[in-house]
Regions:
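Helical hairpin unit composed of two closely spaced alpha helices linked by a short loop
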Residues: 103-105, 109-132, 136-150
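Flexible beta-alpha connector loops of hexameric P-loop NTPases
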Residues: 50-54, 77, 131-143, 174-183
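C-terminal regions of RecA-like/P-loop NTPase motor modules
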Residues: 6, 33-43, 53, 66-70, ...
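Structural recognition of the conserved hydrophobic beta-strand(s) that form the central parallel beta-sheet
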Residues: 13, 123-124, 158-165
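A short helix-to-beta-strand connector/capping loop
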Residues: 62-79
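Walker A/P-loop NTP-binding active-site region of P-loop NTPases
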Residues: 1-49, 126-131, 198-200
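Signature of the SF2 helicase/ATPase Hel1-core->accessory helical subdomain module
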Residues: 129, 165-172
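Functional beta-strand-loop-alpha-helix junction segments that form "active/interaction loops"
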Residues: 77-88
Length: 298
């Protein structure tokens, strides 16, 4: 979250699954937990729970966060309507033109940013929801969008994050039977392999609880249940691939946290809530159940 307050950092987010309002509420939920150590879900914040309105205490917390929200809104541009490859390209070029210039030198088109230090992250969430037009199949639409992102990445230095879903049904079951694990593979990506071929880094997120796996990499999934996730670097043009790490995911507030290694966990029950991450850190020699943050650079 600290990057969102960096003046050189800007996000262009194509949210095809949820509204801009809900996306901002999700970010606010993370911020409230980090700052106030309170678990408020997006439904709580938007007063969409069965219980009704927020309590006065929580309402005041949300009010105190309004200046932060306004600052974040200036750093994130959200598109939450339907999207096809052509609209993606045109809106992205328009946004980049606000932050720089497209010029032609020696017959080649170049991009000169107003701020050479600026980092522009472009998120498409998710590619499988692109609307296919002009007689193209969904695969052709995804492939075209991916090619356009590569072109703008190479010309403008943007960092595209193309989120895709996996087709897990038959793949995970057969693999689990053979190997005892349903780990993500690039071949699992649904609708098109194009983006994975274009990407410099591919990361897969896997939930073994859905595959009814009792033990995964030493972790007791029966106790961790839906909290547990595995993150695997499936492709990496800059270093090692097929490297995995294990994390806890708390969907209510949208945070990922790395747990201790399984040999240092003696009480699994506390991992059902993210509040364990607020416990005082212990010395390196005695770090049982000690929380760790997990950072990714894309």
């Amino acid at each position: 979250m600290e990057h969102l307050e960096d003046e050189d950092f800007h996000v262009i987010y194509y949210s095809l699954e949820i509204s801009a309002e809900l996306l901002m509420a999700k970010l606010l939920s993370i911020y409230i937990f980090e700052k106030y150590h309170v678990e408020l879900s997006t439904k709580d914040i938007l007063s969409r729970t069965k219980g009704g309105l927020l309590s006065d205490e929580y309402f005041h917390i949300v009010e105190e966060c309004i200046p932060w929200l306004r600052r974040i809104e200036s750093m994130i541009t959200i598109f939450d309507g339907s999207l096809n490859a052509q609209t993606l390209y045109s809106t992205l070029v328009n946004e980049l033109a606000k932050a720089g210039q497209f010029v032609e030198e020696e017959g080649r088109k170049k991009y000169i940013p107003n701020n050479p230090k600026q980092i522009v992250v472009v998120v498409i969430d998710h590619m499988n929801l692109l609307t296919h037009t002009m007689g193209r199949t969904i695969k052709q639409e995804i492939d075209l969008a991916s090619q356009q992102l590569v072109g703008l990445r190479n010309m403008c230095g943007i960092s595209p994050v193309a989120i895709m879903q996996a087709n897990r049904d038959s793949m995970s079951m057969s693999r689990r039977d053979m190997l005892g694990s349903g780990d993500c593979r690039i071949s699992d990506i649904r609708d098109s392999a194009g983006p994975s071929q274009d990407a410099e880094i591919v990361i897969g997120i896997y939930n073994p609880f859905r595959d009814k796996i009792a033990n995964y990499r030493g972790y007791d999934i029966k106790q961790l249940q839906d909290v547990f996730r595995s993150i695997t670097v499936l492709k990496n043009r800059y270093g090692e691939s097929e490297v995995a790490d294990c994390i806890c995911f708390y969907g209510k507030i949208g945070i990922f946290v790395e747990p201790p290694t399984p040999d240092k966990i003696y009480d699994y029950s506390k991992f059902q809530s993210p509040l364990w991450t607020l416990e005082p850190k212990q010395d390196e020699e005695d770090e049982d159940d000690r929380p760790k943050t997990l950072n990714f650079t894309l």
